[in-house]
A protein has these predicted regions:
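Conserved N-terminal beta1-alpha1 strand-loop-helix module at the mouth
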Residues: 1-80, 92, 153
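Hydrophobic faces of well-ordered beta-strands that scaffold small-molecule active sites
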Residues: 2-14, 44-46, 65-72, 98-100, ...
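Glycine-rich phosphate-binding active-site loops on the catalytic face of alpha/beta enzymes
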Residues: 11, 69-70, 80, 92-107, ...
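Short, flexible/disordered intra-domain loops and linkers
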Residues: 18-23, 180-188
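Glycine-rich, proline-tolerant flexible connector loops at the mouths of alpha/beta enzymes
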Residues: 33-53, 98-116, 138, 172-185
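Alpha-helix-loop-beta-strand connector modules within alpha/beta enzyme cores
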Residues: 48-72, 112-134, 141, 148-160, ...
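Glycine-rich anion/phosphate-binding loops
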Residues: 74-89, 109-118
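Catalytic cores of alpha/beta
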Residues: 78-92, 142-153, 196-204, 212-228
Length: 248
């Protein structure tokens, strides 16, 4: 197993969030793209305004690194029309994979139809362009029962509308990494929520994201069913893997 092929190397902060200039933020994105090429990561996950720049860097290198972006991030409560428009723009710019934030607040209020419609139409859009769709459920905002229900919901939408052959093209993703929790409760992927998602969303793919910062945690997430790891600590994970391999 080559752990680099599980990694969605991620940088999603805006310049304002990072407290730096737009130029400095762009430099961070460019550095991540070059790192992804050097370490053979699966994907670079960035804001859509950087897709063109990163795509050019990857293309010139000849690397197989994919480019992903987030849609309706981080709250997921925009209208369906806005979600679709944002996704269409990202596809046009050249994104290979789109990570949609599900309208989890609507789901929590019992508005299942809202989630069903947006997930169905977003999958249809992605599949029509041969793109991968990932749905961020924001597990930290949900109870265990809600995690089970929404994971099963996405699974059933795929199997009933798009067939099991497309299960490999749709992910359920744990977290944005931006959700604010109380009392230092983890806001990202935990072993418990990845187990729940995996048990209830398979044969769909699973992405563990938020708080996965070391090699051991990444390995554990993979053993629990994660097919992809979203992390801003890809280099640290890779370096530890290389160190571990040299120890044998």
């Amino acid at each position: 197993m080559k752990i680099s092929h599980y990694l969605d190397a991620t940088y999603l902060k805006t310049a304002i969030q990072a407290g730096i200039t737009e130029k400095e933020n762009l430099e961070k994105v460019v550095a991540l793209a070059k790192e992804a090429i050097s370490y053979d990561y699966k994907l670079v996950m960035i804001r859509s305004n950087y897709i063109t720049t990163v795509k050019k860097i990857v293309s010139i290198s000849g690397a197989k690194v994919l480019i992903g972006t987030v849609i309706d991030f981080p709250c997921g409560d925009s209208s369906l029309k806005q979600k679709i428009q944002e996704a269409e723009k990202a596809i046009k710019l050249g994104a290979d994979e789109l990570d949609f934030v599900v309208n989890y607040n609507a789901f929590k209020k019992g508005n299942i139809d809202v989630v069903t419609e947006e997930v169905t139409l977003c999958i249809a859009l992605c599949l029509s362009h041969q793109k991968i769709a990932k749905f961020i459920i924001e597990a930290a905002a949900l109870s265990n029962e809600e995690i089970i229900v929404i994971s099963q919901l996405v699974k059933h939408i795929v199997l009933e509308n798009f067939g099991e052959e497309n299960a490999k093209n749709v992910f359920v993703k744990s977290s944005t990494g931006f959700f604010k929790t109380e009392r230092e409760i983890p806001n990202g992927a935990t072993f418990e929520n990845i187990m729940l998602i995996s048990k209830n969303a398979k044969p769909l793919k699973i992405k563990a994201a938020g708080g996965v910062r070391d090699y051991e945690t990444a390995l554990k997430m993979i053993s629990l069913g994660a097919d992809r790891i979203g992390t801003s600590s890809s280099k640290e994970i890779i370096n530890k893997e290389q160190h571990s391999n040299q120890s044998y």
